[in-house]
Amino acid sequence: SDLQDILDLINDRYVEVPDMELVIKGGIQSALERSHPFNSWLNASDLSEEDPGGASAGMTLIKRGIYASVLTVVPGGPADRAGLRPGEVIRRLNGLSLNKISAWKMQRLTRGPEGTEIEVQRYPKDTVEPVKTILKLENIKFPPLGFQTSSRGSLITLSDLRAGRDKEFNTLLGRLSPNQPLILDLRNNSEGTMEVALNIANLLCSEGLFATLRSTNKPNVNLTLTPSNPRPSMKLIVLQDSSTSGVAELLASALKRHGKAKTWGSQTAGLGVALGRIPLSQGGALEIVMERWTGAGREEVDQTGVKADKPIKDFGPQDRLIDFILDTLNDTVQGSKAS
């Protein structure tokens, strides 16, 4: 085959004697990443490594070939306090170039024993020179859901969809003023479970399809909404952007389709997938995407994500967010009446 001919030519005619094992491994890893940035090839020595530890830098990275981008940061965590923000580019971790490692290995480098320091070479937004930042790993304490209210409406910030967030969210719903607009901020949200996302959707949506889970050589699995109460009558605004990822994308889609929500911001990440691990005969494994998701509005959230109804590039400072949204909403309503 052409592939074997290429390998033979590299081995026989390259200017220096190549390490063919590294050539082949790099080629396989590159092919896997082209299929999906979460895919990884793990060799036997990778699998024999001890767990790095439970402390974390408080950020989620997504590998993009020779670099990584920050997908989300945990509010109040080490990365957040150091000024890292979603969308920033990271080129090296502890001096190691990211083009030489898998997505699996990259994530492990951001974990370790509490107090461990890692060096991050990063490119903050709107800069051309790299900045080195030291992060000290911590056992992350996730803050409560953000909640702000005023006489005109309320804002709930969902920075993750971990276990228990659905109950916490339900409690906050009981504090809302009747018929006042609710702003649900799903930005900077990439962690959580399908169950929690579905439970929150059941609190705000009418009956219907929540998501379709697609796997190779298996029937599609449809998850449906089964709300115990009628859909609340409040006006619902969902904030989203490229840091809205995974199950948060399914929640945004369901709220848009069955909760009559309007989505503001920009398109979500398009990373609605689940990984699986396949053992290999020589002791290694493939960690690859084995399930892809479709949203309630038939969006392919594994690729294109959920589009925003109202594009907004800059929401302004966080402490003014609720006023900005409600002022914009009021201007939109007044403009519609005038027309």
Model-identified regions with their sequence ranges:
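Cleft-lining beta-strand/loop regions that shape enzyme active-site pockets
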Residues: 80, 85, 94-97, 104-281
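Conserved functional hotspot residues or short segments at active or partner-binding sites
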Residues: 301-302, 318-339
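PDZ/PDZ-like domain segments forming the peptide/carboxylate-binding groove
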Residues: 51-92, 96-101, 163
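Generic structural signal for buried aliphatic residues
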Residues: 90-91, 118, 301
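C-terminal "exit" segments of structured domains
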Residues: 282-289, 293
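Acidic/histidine-rich, surface-exposed loop or edge segments in extracytoplasmic proteins
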Residues: 3-13
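Extended, small/polar residue-biased N-terminal targeting/export presequences
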Residues: 12-71, 115-119, 123-147, 336-339
